[in-house]
From Swiss-Prot:
GO terms for biological process: bacterial-type flagellum organization. This is Basal-body rod modification protein FlgD. Keywords: Bacterial flagellum biogenesis. Residues 1-30 are annotated as: Disordered. Required for flagellar hook formation. May act as a scaffolding protein. InterPro entries: FlgD. Pfam families: FlgD (PF03963). Signal peptide: none annotated. Residues 1-15 have a biased composition (Polar residues). It comes from Yersinia enterocolitica. The keyword Nuclease does not apply. Belongs to the FlgD family.
Length: 47
């Protein structure tokens, strides 16, 4: 199943227009969790 990523972290196969779960090694739940983790970290670090 092809997925489109919207984050910018190469560890999750991101910053490419298309990817598959087999090439990224991440499920959609993993991507959602990593996005939320990055979002919370960014919110905590803003001035």
């Amino acid at each position: 199943m092809a997925i489109t990523n919207s984050l910018t972290d190469s560890d999750y196969g991101i910053n490419s227009t298309t990817g598959t779960s087999s090439t990224t090694g991440s499920s959609s739940q993993d991507l959602q969790n990593s996005f939320l983790t990055l979002l919370v970290a960014q919110l905590k670090n803003q001035d």
